[in-house]
């Protein structure tokens, strides 16, 4: 085990800072000596008094959407629904609830691109997977817009999103309008594929297209609908980046084609056929011009175009309410320096939505509804994730692209795994309980597994935690109050927690209330924003969140909450109006205490109507 591999969290595979990762991570399924050594240090950390907080728990009661959500909407002209963690929080349900308010008539996506993925259901129970299309398309009488600061691959948009609407007979021609978006071309997606670490990107071309955008190269949608000579000229200028990359890397078209075939080799189409055709095309610019003429400009099914920012301002001036549907999340925003190396390429905070919506925020009142998910708070891709069951890049580093890459029967007994984890790995019965978990072993017919690995795999299986875009298993973990506190301080207080009915499956739940810093080296000190971080330092909710280079070495201090297995809250098992179980009230009280958020709703099932509004 090399020194790099000794830098790990107490129960999962080790964490290594981005940019300094060695070729071999030495991740294992079983508990290794390095993890035991980390635990031997962390188990002696002095307990923090906050583990005994809150002293009392609030009582929460169910109320109607009209009593809880609608008064918030009615006080404001612009309602933003924003992710509060690392994306995939289940925002669609809250988006639908806001969209269904009678006064909310204008619904828009105003930034980012098809790397966002959300699953929504219409009133008939039909499932739709949208990336750029606003969820309001499934609500009657709503106008839906994709704003000009979004980035769009129009071929993918038509094939994967508009096609769903056509097949379901959704009258999108009267409901969906597209602004002068920046165009994601096949070479942007190929640059993403060729330049990204394995399994670290959605392969949707986000970083390359935003690079084209900020350097004032590339094309926008209007270029496709106007003079073809201008379109050709701009494409020739922008594509130089792609050709230059191939030259520097010594790659031929044949090399790129083999890479595409390898990426699609497991049956999941990550590189679409038209991108492969682009690689094979002799004259790539002419291929693109013809592609866009045939499948965008001359396509009668392409949605109507308009000046979205002007339409939005006009709607506000008429007294209409506007909903901005946030992609990704606060901590995935490229405008947040704490995680900037491992984020998306747009500002996906609420302030980023406000800026790209292009309205006068001095004239119109706005409000943010943040959405988090628990249990099973998750992240995809690479980067730090202090509250995760395993290192954030565990699946990527071990070559797991989808759950099919794991042994079929590996860690399928979720109940036994969660029971071992929450009732044996923690030791709350001891006087010196400090919120650190012990790296126990779980064994099934396929082998022995570190309990963190077992929880990560079992959670992904049990909760269906795979990317809506990539199908990659998400890395799950505890609800993180340290990170949520900052989200609340910047764009709170309203918080909706989705998927809380998952708690029906747990004996206990964990909430991260602080971190302890430990890098495995006694004399190594990190200086982040003027503060020095050394082994044993505690970072509590409400304190400054350190940069990602320090967060790789942060380990969660976990407060345990009693579960509610005997009184499930899932919509299929609970009658509306039934009292909320004590465990649910303990969980909500703990989150509110440590984050200062105000919880307005919890999700309790897959359907849009499966949501419990909270009266306090």
Swiss-Prot record:
The keyword Ribosomal protein does not apply. GO terms for cellular component: cytoplasm. Its main location: cytoplasm. IMP binds at residues 88-91, 115-118, 202, 216, 328, 343, 472. Its EC number is 6.3.4.4. Keywords: Cytoplasm, GTP-binding, Ligase, Magnesium, Metal-binding, Nucleotide-binding, Purine biosynthesis. Mg(2+) binds at residues 88, 117. Its cofactor is Mg(2+). The active site is at residues 88, 118. Binds 1 Mg(2+) ion per subunit. Residues 17-27 have a biased composition (Polar residues). It is found in: Cytoplasm. Transmembrane segments: none annotated. One of its GO terms (biological process) is IMP metabolic process. The keyword Transmembrane helix does not apply. Residues 1-27 are annotated as: Disordered. Substrate binds at residues 468-474. It comes from the Eukaryota. Coiled coil: none annotated. Pathway: Purine metabolism; AMP biosynthesis via de novo pathway; AMP from IMP: step 1/2. Parasitic protozoa lack the de novo purine biosynthesis pathway and rely exclusively on the salvage pathway for their purine nucleotide requirements. Belongs to the adenylosuccinate synthetase family. This is Adenylosuccinate synthetase 1. The lineage of its organism: Eukaryota, Discoba, Euglenozoa, Kinetoplastea, Metakinetoplastina.
